[in-house]
C-alpha cells in the first residue's frame, strides 16, 4: 500500500471522480486488482495470458482492451469518443489532470492525444551514456543532435527543458489504437500529434526508490475531496 491505499486505487479514484469519464474498464489477470476495481464500478476485461507476461508490451494490452471495449459498446449501440488510459502502477494522477487533458482534445480536433508530462532535466539525453566495447562511457546520442555542442555544458538546464510523458495518464482518440503502427515511438498509442498536460514529478513505479517520491507527490497534489 501507498499511504493507506493500494497502488491501483489512485488511478481508479481519479477516473471515478472525473466529470468526463462515463465508463471504467480494467484489463487484468490479477484477482486482487479485479476485486478492488469492482469497488469503483469498473468492468473487468480478462487479460489473455500472452499479454500478462514480463515480455508483453503495454501497447498490445491497450489494443486488446480497446477492441474488447469497442465490442461491448457497439452491442449497446454506443461509440467510443476518447479513451483515457491509466496505469495500475501510476498513482500520480488526479481527476483534475484527466479533465484538463479531455478539455484540450475537445478544443483542438487536430490533436491525437493529451498526456501527463513532467520536466526531468537531470535525465536529459545530453547526459545519457552507453558502455562501449572497451568498457568506457560514450555519449548515447551524438551531441550534435542537440545543436551546437559549444553551447552545451554541465548545467542540467543548458539544453532547455526536457519533458517526459510520465505515464500518469494518456488520453487518446480511438484512431490512435485502431492504427497504432502509425504512432510516434516509443509510446505508439499516443499517435503523432501529442499535447502535454503539465504536472510535476509524475511517474509510474518500477523501482523501490520511487516509492518515497510518489508519497511526496500524493501528499502535495492528491485532493481526496475533489469531485470533478
What are these regions (language model features)?
Residues 1-27:
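N-terminal glycine-rich phosphate-binding loop and ensuing alpha1 helix
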Residues 21, 78-80, 108-111:
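Short, high-confidence coil segments that cap the C-terminus of an alpha-helix
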Residues 25, 31-84, 92-100:
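Short phosphate-binding loop-to-helix
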Residues 31, 175-176, 209:
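Alpha-helix/helix-capping structural signal
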Residues 179, 188, 195-228:
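Hydrophobic helical membrane-anchoring modules
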